Structure formats: C-alpha cells, structure tokens
Swiss-Prot record:
Cross-link (Glycyl lysine isopeptide (Lys-Gly) (interchain with G-Cter in ubiquitin)): 6, 11, 27, 29, 33, 48, 63
Name of the protein in its database record: Polyubiquitin-C
Keywords: ADP-ribosylation, Cytoplasm, Isopeptide bond, Membrane, Mitochondrion, Mitochondrion outer membrane, Nucleus, Phosphoprotein, Repeat, Ubl conjugation
InterPro entries associated with the record: Ubiquitin-like_dom, Ubiquitin-like_domsf, Ubiquitin_CS, Ubiquitin_dom, Ubiquitin_ubiquitin-like
UniProt-annotated site: Essential for function, residues: 68
UniProt record similarity statement: Belongs to the ubiquitin family.
Single GO term (MF): protein tag activity
Organism: Bos taurus (Bovine)
Domain Ubiquitin-like: 1-76, 77-152, 153-228, 229-304, 305-380, 381-456, 457-532, 533-608, 609-684
Additional note from the record: Ubiquitin is encoded by 4 different genes. Uba52 and Rps27a genes code for a single copy of ubiquitin fused to the ribosomal proteins eL40 and eS31, respectively. UBB and UBC genes code for a polyubiquitin precursor with exact head to tail repeats, the number of repeats differ between species and strains. For the sake of clarity sequence features are annotated only for the first chain, and are not repeated for each of the following chains.
ADP-ribosylglycine carried by residues: 76
PROSITE patterns in alphabetical order: UBIQUITIN_1, UBIQUITIN_2
Propeptide span(s): 685-690
Length: 690
C-alpha cells in the first residue's frame, strides 16, 4: 500500500509499504529516498512517536495514512535545571524532547518521580505533552524545578473590605481546605465564600497547584449574598429533593448539597437538565437554570464492569467501563489502547450503530457484552443538497457520515448554522445522530435543505387541571423539543406527556409546522397513567414477545419497544390486531387493545433487492435484502433458508471475504450480485470455492 511522510519543511514523501513493515524498515526506505540516517529520524502518527520494533499494523496505519517526520538534531544541546535548594543539574536534550522526557531524565539523575516535578520556564509551568521547542527553550536555558509537596508556603487572601489574611498552605491543598482555614481565622462558613484568582472563580475540588497558585500569591474573597433560590432535584424513584442554591453555584457544589441531604457521593451522581448532562465545573447560570427549575438525578452504578470490543481483524480488546460511560468515552478508551482516532471508529452492538452522546446503559450493554468495531472506510461518495432557492450543492461524504457531519459540511460551504438546517430525504426529516447508510442514502442521492425560520412564536398548552402554560417555540421545533420545554417549566418527564392538537396525538419526531400548528394555537396535555399492562406480539416465525405497555402508548411507542427487544427497525414493522393494520399515531386504547391481547407482527420487505448466493455444490439461493443489511443479517437469512449456522459461513464477493459488521453497500454489492458461500469445516480445514 502507499503511505505519505510529511517533513517539517512541508515536503511530502510517498512510500510503498506493507502493513507488516516495521518502523525500522520504513526509516530505511526514507533513508533510501532522502538520505536521512534512521537514527536521526523520529516518526509521529496520531500524536504518538513510533517505536522501531513495532509494525505499521500495530499502530493501525492504513493505506494513504500520513506520518510526520521530525529530525533529531545531532549533538543535541545542554540545558540546566535549577532546584529550590540551589543545586543545578545539567541535561543532554533535543529541542524535540517532550517535557515528559525531560522529567524522566531528571528522575534518572536525581530519583525524583515525574509526578512530583513541576518545571517552570519564563515564569510558566511546562505541560508534559509539549516539547522544548514549543516553549522556545534553547541551548543552555535554565529551567526551575519545583517539587509538588510537602513543606508548605504562605498565600494571602484579600477581602472586599481591604483586609488581608495570611494562610499557611501547601500546593496540594484543595480550595475546600483553604476555605476551611479561612473559616478558622475569620468565622465565615465555606458555603458563603467565593475565591477568585487571576479573574477566575476557584472550584472546591481543585488544588492550589491546579491553578498555579504559588507562594505569596493573593486570592480575592467575595461573599455569596444570601437570598439565593430554590431548585428541585427529581430522582429515578420519583422522590423530589429541594435545594437552596445560587446561580453562581457550580454543578460540583450542587452535588455536594445532594450528598449532604441524601448521602449519595458526587462521583455517583449524574445531573440532567433539558436533556443535557451537566458538567462539574460549570455554574447553574451557565445552563440558564432558574428558580424552581427541576434537575433529574441519575445514579452512576459503581464497581464498573468489563466489556469486549472485537475488531474486524478478529482481535478482541478488553475495556474497564461503567454503565454511565458514553460511547464517546468508550471510543477514547479504544484510542488509548489501539491508537485509532475516535472519528474513524464505528461501534456496533446488536446490529445497531452506537451514537457518541448515549451511554452504555442506554443501549442495555451489560458486563462482558461484546461490541464490534468497524473502521470508517475512506474514499466516500458524492451527494447533492438542493435548497429552496433551487441551488444545488455537491458534498463529498461517506456512508458512515452522520447527518450532523453532513450539516457541518453544509455550514463549511454555505455558512448556514446546523441548528437552522433541516434535511429531507424520501419525504422524511433526517435525525442528527443517524448515518447516511441508515437512511439508505447512496452515491448521487439528492437531499433537500429546508431552513428553520428564526423569530419563533408563542403557543399555549392546556392541562387537564385547566392550567395553561405559554411556550416560546419555532415552527421547526419537534414535538420532542416541545415536551422538553414543558419538562423545564412543569417538571413532567416527556415520556409521561401526550400532546393533542385538533383531536390528534402528536408524534415526537414531527415538527409543529408538520401539524400546521401556528402562533397562539392551543395544544392539550394528557398525562400517561402509570400502571401498565402486558400484551403479546406474535411474529410470522411463531415466536411470541411479551411487552410492558400502557393503554396510552402509541403504536409508534410499541414498535420502539419491539425494536429494543428484537432489533427490528420500526419502519420495517406492520402490526395487525383484529385483522386491521395499526397506525403509528394512534394509541392502544384507540384500538381497544387490552391486557394480554395478541398483536401480529408482519415485516415490510423493503423495495429492497435480490441477490444470489452460490454454494460449493453449485446450488444458487435467492435472498431478499437491502443495501443497508449487514453481512451478519445476510448470514442469518442463509441460516433461515439452508440451516447453516452463521459461524460456519464465509461469504466471498469479488475475491474478498466479507466481514460481519459491514453492510452490503459498504462492499458495493448491488441487485442481482452473486456471493459465494464457503463453509468453515470443523477442525480447521477450509473448503474452497475455487
């Protein structure tokens, strides 16, 4: 394959390599082309220096990857490191050495662990991942070494009255400790203290050294004015806690107050407002949380768990995670282990691509579950986007791009912010977290771009108690958005809300303008009664699924529950009761479906397409498939027809073995293509189609 090597002068070298080549081999090829001795070469990929004895495939370097070449300057240079005791150490270094490397050299000479070292140059603390040349540190420069620890220092705290207090502290003291010392001296309770340094409010859980507060620094003490406001915190058990807070309180402070009331450690708390997880260092006012707002408290389950990630090469990676970890966190852990950038990772579980912002528990991923890792293939395709003015934009995309990615590309070309864009394909509004392949959008497809009109309007929502709520909305808001606004005002979870307009129940994914809801329209809010009932769903294979539902659930909700259990997308489901096909927007009670009723599930075959599978005996099987079917799905269809277990099947197309997690469209398999089926024989012998 070809890879590129970019030098610091901007020159790019092309090399012919193989995945099994070592970094040493690659340096040899660079020497042949450029005459640079291997011992003067440092190769960098994905921000990581590559080691001579490892191979390109060890670092997941694929065709057309770009490595960066940094030259080791010969003879290097000397720098000096001065300690607080006045001792000066001489080090042999190179401009390309990282601060981390320098600390390791100091450890070699002086035995001081790197995590106890702080290096200062030109009054600035140096960061581990940066290089000496980043800080313009040249030969014979002097760095200052400060030990994290032990022995303390004095700082000053200045109050608004002008009084200055002197405190004995250590760099490792937390802001909380400092406030306790102020309370000892001045009698001011910590929760009434706000400490400011360099114009920044200091957070309780951070240390003085985190803020680079050194000896004889001056902090400013501001008192929190009493008065505050009340907010509510609702737990999953339905219990509501009332807290006294101020807009300037951080989320960390709020979690501490919850701990005081409920005994739940902050690191087990996740707080949600307006559907968004709140970050510790931000304040209530940053999130526009006002008096009598309701936050939702979700517990992080302790103890963590192990999950497995299987790559297409068959390698299995073990990760330590928690149910509350987001998919984004998981991708970061994979990057740490394997060096694969998150934006090149697609994670699949139960045949479904996982979205960055969701958690493992959202997908019911439990201990020892196996996720499949598919790399986003480079190469892509062109699609067209047509605006209402008739202008057509051409975009370079990949089937694995999300709608969010596509909107970002449109913003790059046209300057339209993503939140003002609505994309329509085949009459359907596309959701940000889904991919082009999810919607079967193929090369040269045309999407339609509709702008969300700014300026908004007011609508009214009338509850069964007769209370009327006023909401600020836009015609392009979805019903889901409207329910979130009602939750912010009234604290009613969206899944307990049913909205009715013109006698019709409104569906989450549709917009106000879809229902012709205009300014000053009145919607009616009906609460879903808790208590529920069981119904049965019988499939054509004879399998019966049991679902927990409520009479007020819509058919759409029921299909979503079936998807959760069986993985069948709602748009492929038709539900039949009493000989009648059920409509998405209607409720179970509309059809008089009562407890222990049985619905029948019929699958909608997609316009789809036919493909052929040829076995070694010469037999040809015809399958109904869709471009978005995974190879795993295809093997399941073959099992249904022929009884061959998927793990004994190998499928070949265009001389290439097909991987389970990839789709037919990934391999450009089109209607009436022929795949070859080879059986994996037990005992390791493989039969061949050729």
């Amino acid at each position: 394959m070809q890879i590129f090597v970019k030098t610091l002068t901007g020159k790019t070298i092309t090399l012919e390599v193989e995945p099994s080549d070592t970094i040493e081999n690659v340096k040899g090829k660079i020497q042949e082309k450029e005459g640079i001795p291997p011992d003067q070469q440092r190769l960098i990929f994905a921000g990581k220096q590559l080691e001579d004895g490892r191979t390109l495939s060890d670092y997941n370097i694929q065709k057309e990857s770009t490595l960066h070449l940094v030259l080791r300057l010969r003879g290097g240079m000397q720098i000096f490191v001065k300690t607080l005791t006045g001792k000066t150490i001489t080090l042999e270094v190179e401009p390309s050495d990282t601060i981390e490397n320098v600390k390791a050299k100091i450890q070699d000479k002086e035995g001081i662990p790197p995590d106890q070292q702080r290096l200062i140059f030109a009054g600035k603390q140096l960061e581990d991942g940066r290089t000496l040349s980043d800080y313009n540190i040249q030969k014979e420069s002097t760095l200052h070494l400060v030990l994290r620890l032990r022995g303390g220092m004095q700082i000053f705290v200045k109050t608004l009255t002008g009084k200055t207090i002197t405190l004995e502290v250590e760099p490792s003291d937390t802001i909380e400790n400092v406030k306790a010392k102020i309370q000892d001296k001045e009698g001011i309770p910590p929760d009434q203290q706000r400490l400011i340094f360099a114009g920044k409010q200091l957070e309780d859980g951070r240390t003085l050294s985190d803020y680079n507060i050194q000896k004889e620094s001056t902090l400013h003490l501001v008192l929190r004015l009493r008065g505050g406001m009340q907010i509510f915190v609702k737990t999953l058990t339905g219990k509501t806690i009332t807290l006294e807070v101020e807009p300037s309180d951080t989320i960390e402070n709020v979690k501490a107050k919850i701990q005081d009331k409920e005994g739940i450690p902050p690191d087990q708390q996740r707080l949600i407002f307006a559907g968004k997880q709140l970050e510790d260092g931000r304040t209530l006012s940053d999130y526009n949380i006002q008096k009598e707002s309701t936050l939702h408290l979700v517990l992080r389950l302790r103890g963590g768990m192990q999950i497995f990630v299987k790559t297409l090469t068959g390698k299995t990676i073990t990760l330590e995670v928690e149910p509350s970890d987001t998919i984004e966190n998981v991708k970061a852990k994979i990057q740490d282990k394997e060096g694969i950038p998150p934006d090149q990772q697609r994670l699949i579980f139960a045949g479904k691509q996982l979205e960055d912002g969701r958690t493992l528990s959202d997908y019911n991923i439990q201990k020892e579950s196996t996720l499949h890792l598919v790399l986003r293939l480079r190469g892509g395709m062109q699609i067209f986007v047509k605006t209402l003015t008739g202008k057509t934009i051409t975009l370079e995309v990949e089937p694995s791009d999300t709608i969010e990615n596509v909107k970002a590309k449109i913003q790059d070309k046209e300057g339209i912010p993503p939140d003002q864009q609505r994309l329509i394909f085949a009459g359907k509004q596309l959701e940000d977290g889904r991919t082009l392949s999810d919607y079967n959008i193929q090369k040269e497809s045309t999407l339609h771009l509709v702008l969300r009109l700014r300026g908004g309007m007011q609508i009214f929502v009338k509850t069964l108690t007769g209370k009327t709520i006023t909401l600020e909305v836009e015609p392009s808001d979805t019903i889901e958005n409207v329910k979130a606004k009602i939750q912010d005002k009234e604290g009613i979870p969206p899944d307990q809300q049913r909205l009715i307009f013109a006698g019709k129940q409104l569906e989450d994914g549709r917009t106000l303008s879809d229902y012709n809801i205009q300014k000053e329209s009145t919607l009616h809010l009906v609460l879903r009664l808790r208590g529920g009932m069981q119904i049965f769903v019988k499939t054509l294979t004879g399998k019966t699924i049991t679902l927990e539902v409520e009479p007020s659930d819509t058919i759409e909700n029921v299909k979503a529950k079936i998807q959760d259990k069986e993985g069948i997308p709602p748009d492929q489901q038709r539900l039949i009761f009493a000989g009648k096909q059920l409509e998405d927007g209607r409720t179970l009670s509309d059809y008089n479906i009562q407890k222990e009723s049985t619905l029948h599930l019929v699958l909608r075959l997609r316009g789809g397409m036919q493909i052929f599978v040829k076995t070694l005996t010469g037999k040809t099987i015809t399958l109904e498939v869709e471009p978005s079917d995974t190879i795993e799905n295809v093997k399941a269809k073959i099992q249904d027809k022929e009884g061959i277990p998927p793990d004994q099947q190998r499928l070949i197309f265009a001389g290439k073995q097909l991987e389970d997690g990839r789709t037919l469209s990934d391999y450009n398999i089109q209607k009436e293509s022929t795949l070859h089926l080879v059986l994996r024989l037990r005992g390791g012998v493989l039969s061949s189609p050729f």
